[in-house]
Regions:
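Gly/Pro-rich, tryptophan- and cysteine-flecked surface segments typical
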Residues: 1-505
Length: 505
């Protein structure tokens, strides 16, 4: 793990000197998962954001023994969405796809802004790139300097569903073990799971199967210690699968920072989120921050921003066994809001010591069924670097299809607060598909007030008839007067209610 303050220092240095420690390769790995079709999608942000016309993408299919089957190269030189269906790319069984981007110009970030999709009957899962082969020994020095455990974003065990984990090996065979630990208010359950995986191999582990005697509907915190892998940055894909193990909703795991002492020198971190009235809105905070005791509160804001109510919802002690799980929908009703009144909400963490952990992780959950979306986010702080004198730009993906509904929410992240909370900022949104730009829209909003829209309704004239079977991917670019706005997208399968979502880049 790279320390949060080191991440901020890197951002500052890039803004001062853009050619410093330049990056010319970025990459990701995509697992082939039985029962689903693997795809990737991305907007040519290299060109749109940085005017980089010299980018190539190489996709390599890797077999079950870790050997290359074949590689294909594509020029990325148009201002549009690029989508690649990876499953079926070759006629041999595939373990993993290695996706790489190369450029003679500086790519800046070794992790590309790429969405990974796995879709099957009744579901579509999306997660941004979450593991990669490192570029050189200098990256190894920085990225793997601080080893930490991972924490699951969703421990759910009952007769109909289970948490699962997908472990991926890097470019060398991995022989070692995964150490699983489940902490509840009264017990600790542990197991050591042996691993022997070919290079670029994947292994799916269903928690219910390795802990067969756990109580039904157990609530707790799942922590996982991975074996170290050189030249590899590897998060786990973790999530919730139904009893068939083929239908799932997943995201990447969280850092467990509970043994890392890193703090901001103040006492408040927070983050605003859009409230989607069509869905259940929940947040879950885990006791995996740097050692601390935090007071957690929820601020509920009306659609117009005029009505606001804040209430404390619990104490989060890290390390510890107790998580905080709150239905914002139910809480808002207790606070006197009807669902149609709610426009946004904020999660706030207060410290009484004058310092607060740099990474306070939470799971943002939007749902309609047993498989809700799961979005991994961290709270923001006033000490984080925010460039001055420049516009903000964020971009991301929404899914469209005749059987899918998608919503997009745009909101100020929460820090730093504007001098005038009533500033009415101009928000410009440009939409793209595989043909290029298809639409532009503008809205105005102020601090804490969300812009929320249905993609299908907003772009009804531009997207036309949608496929009954195969979804498509719309990408949006949001330009704002200050780099403090963020976006969230959620997709629901109309037939099953299964959801998936992700934050913007």
């Amino acid at each position: 793990m790279k320390l949060r303050k080191e991440v901020e220092a890197t951002r500052r240095s890039y803004h001062l000197e853009p050619t410093l420690n330049s990056v010319h390769r970025s990459s990701l790995l995509v697992p082939e998962i039985p029962g689903s079709i693997a795809e990737i999608s991305f907007l040519n942000h290299f060109l749109i954001k940085r005017n980089n016309k010299y980018v190539a993408c190489r996709i390599t299919a890797i077999d079950l023994e870790g050997r290359r089957i074949e590689s294909r190269q594509y020029q990325i030189d148009e201002p549009r969405v690029y989508t690649f269906t990876l499953s079926g790319m070759v006629n041999i069984s595939v373990s993993t796809y290695l996706v790489e981007f190369f450029s003679s110009a500086n790519l800046f970030i070794p992790f590309p802004a790429v969405m990974i999709m796995h879709r099957g009957p009744g579901f579509l899962n999306q997660v941004h790139a979450y593991n990669r082969i490192l570029n050189d020994i200098f990256e190894e020095d920085v990225v793997n300097k601080v080893p930490v455990r991972e924490a699951s974003i969703d421990l759910d065990l009952n007769e109909n569903s289970s948490t699962f984990v997908i472990f991926t090996a890097g470019q060398f065979e991995c022989e070692g073990e995964l150490v699983f630990q489940i902490l509840t208010a009264t017990n600790v359950y542990s197991i050591t799971y042996p691993l022997k995986i070919k290079r670029f191999g994947n292994q799916r582990i269903v928690i219910r199967e390795i802990f067969p005697n756990l109580p039904a509907d157990i609530k707790g915190v799942l922590k996982i210690q991975q074996p170290s892998q050189v030249f590899f940055y590897g998060r786990l894909m973790v999530g919730k699968c139904l009893s068939d193990c083929d239908t799932f909703s997943a995201n990447h795991s969280y850092y467990d920072s509970s043994e890392t002492h890193e703090y901001w020198d103040n006492n408040l971190s927070l983050r605003f989120f859009p409230f989607f009235q069509e869905l259940e809105n929940r947040v879950c905070l885990y006791p995996i921050a740097s050692p601390s005791t935090l007071r957690i509160s929820i601020l509920v804001v009306s659609v117009d921003g005029l009505k606001q109510r804040e209430v404390e919802v619990g104490i989060l002690t890290s390390p510890g066994p107790e998580l905080i799980d709150v239905s914002v929908t139910s809480l808002a009703e207790v606070l006197g809001f009807s669902v149609r009144e709610i426009g946004s909400f904020a999660v706030k963490a207060y410290s009484d010591t004058g310092r607060i952990p740099t990474r306070i992780s939470q799971q943002l959950i939007y749902g309609k069924s047993k498989l809700p979306s799961s979005i991994n986010v961290i709270l923001v702080n006033s000490e984080e670097f925010v460039p001055t004198g420049r516009n903000g730009l964020t971009w991301g993906q929404s899914v469209i299809g005749s059987h899918y509904d998608s919503w997009l929410g745009i909101i100020h992240r929460g820090m730093p607060e504007p001098e005038n909370l009533e500033d009415n900022d101009l928000i410009e949104v440009t939409f793209y598909d595989i043909t290029g730009e298809i639409a532009r829209r503008t809205w105005r909003t102020s601090y804490g007030v969300a812009i929320r829209l249905s993609i299908k309704e907003e772009l009804a004239n531009e997207i036309g008839n949608l496929s009954d079977e195969i979804p498509s991917y719309i990408w949006w670019v949001i330009t704002t007067p200050k780099p403090v706005y963020y976006a969230y997208s959620v997709t629901v399968n109309q037939k099953t209610g299964n959801c998936s979502g992700e934050h913007g880049f």
